[in-house]
Amino acid sequence: MASSQPPLPPPPPPLLLLALLLLLKVSDTSSSVSTATSTASETDNLTSKPLTSSFSSSSPTVWEKQTSQEKPETASTSHPDSSSSESTISHSPSNSGTTSTTQPTSSQPEPDTHPSSGSPSSEHTVTSPSLGSVSLATLPWSPTHPKPSTGPPSVSLATTDRTFETSGYAPGDSGVPRLHRNPGVVVAVCLLVSALLIGGAIMAVRRCHNGVSEFQKLDEGLVSRRSSSAHHTLP
């Protein structure tokens, strides 16, 4: 009797083999990417810690230097906001120059309204930044008056004096330049005007006398002619 052998199983198709190989490769790449991201996050944490610590340690010294250089002033401003958050700045006049600031928590710019001194209805609005900046103080000017200069007062006074000297306008004048009068020139002009007036009067008198003399001559001639004609008619 011939020995019966079991039939051999059919070989797996090549498509299944390719699918298995692709799955293995994808799993390897995903594991490598996850390890790379974890190492990158660790390095970021390590580098960010010393930076934040150094910034926090250096910021108080800079703030102290700025406050020590500033002059002691007293000013306070309040800005209304929709979320009822306030921003105040107070400078206490002390030798140490300590200041306390409270910044608003909203991220939108806050309007600062200031009524003008000239008209009660007109308002001057100024938008101040929300975070990381100091809010503006109360503006002392109105739309009808010019904006005050931000430079030192000595420089502004010098510039105004120079402008008055170059343009010839005085601070109280209404726009008419001053004329520097020389007394000698004024006297000469007065003498010329008086001489012209006197000469004109003399010429007018002479012309009047000339006219009268001519009329007299004509009258005398007519009288002599009449007398001569009368003498001729008498004999």
UniProtKB/Swiss-Prot annotation:
Keyword Glycoprotein applies: yes
Region span, Disordered: 28-159
Residue ranges annotated as Extracellular topological domain: 32-184
Signal peptide: 1-31
Ranges annotated as biased composition (Low complexity): 28-61, 76-110
Cytoplasmic face of the membrane: 206-235
Location within or outside the cell: Membrane
Annotated transmembrane regions: 185-205
Top-level taxon in the UniProt lineage: Eukaryota
Keywords (A to Z) from UniProt: Glycoprotein, Membrane, Signal, Transmembrane, Transmembrane helix
Membrane topology (UniProt): Single-pass type I membrane protein
Record flagged with keyword Transmembrane: yes
GO cellular component terms, A-Z: membrane
Glycan-carrying positions: N45
Expression sites by tissue: Highly expressed in large intestine, small intestine, rumen, and kidney tissues.
Residue ranges with Polar residues bias: 114-136
Record-given protein name: Protein CIST1
Organism of derivation: Bos taurus
Biological classification of the source: Eukaryota, Metazoa, Chordata, Craniata, Vertebrata
Gene (name only): CIST1
